[in-house]
């Protein structure tokens, strides 16, 4: 039996269930053998590089509410993915109300878990294997979650922890 959804997830008039507690996309992660060219493409599409990862060769591009991550970290999952698949989306991140619960439910339903390595001071984000060797991250920390306002205690997102502004 599924628990009732938090108010922020249950939309008026919605008749379907949301057992994973999803609440949108947090980011799409890209990898390419030539990350510079991919970044230039993002800029031509109107995205701006706004932050860099604190410890890795990873940039955050944003346009409105859309977040692209460009991962150029040598010997990372993303770069191994790019060597195998070429320029591509290597991962997506869903916003979920409770990442641990969503991960456990996905595994119970037959998904394959992915054990990544979080570095010092980084969030450990649960992930499952997606289509074509890609990853699906389950993120439960984002700004504005459950209606949080600027300055509210706990209104700290994934990007606030792992990235610093350019």
Question: Model-found features: residue ranges?
Answer:
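An N-terminus-focused feature that recognizes amino-terminal "leader" regions
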Residues: 1-142, 148-164
């Amino acid at each position: 039996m599924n628990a009732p959804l938090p108010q922020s997830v249950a939309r008026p008039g919605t008749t379907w269930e949301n057992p994973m507690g999803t609440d949108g996309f947090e980011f799409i992660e890209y990898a390419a053998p030539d990350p510079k060219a991919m970044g230039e493409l993002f800029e031509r599409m109107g995205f701006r590089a706004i932050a860099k990862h604190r410890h890795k060769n990873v940039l955050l591009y944003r346009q409105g509410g859309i977040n692209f991550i460009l991962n150029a970290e040598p010997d990372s999952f993303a770069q191994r993915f790019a060597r195998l698949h070429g320029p591509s989306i290597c991962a997506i991140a869903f916003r979920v109300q409770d990442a641990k619960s969503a991960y456990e439910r996905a595994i119970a339903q037959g998904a394959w878990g992915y054990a990544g390595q979080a570095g010092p001071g980084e969030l450990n984000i649960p992930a499952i294997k997606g289509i074509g060797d890609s990853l699906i991250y389950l993120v439960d920390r984002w700004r504005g979650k459950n209606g949080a306002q600027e300055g509210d205690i706990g209104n700290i997102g994934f990007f606030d922890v792992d990235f610093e502004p350019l």
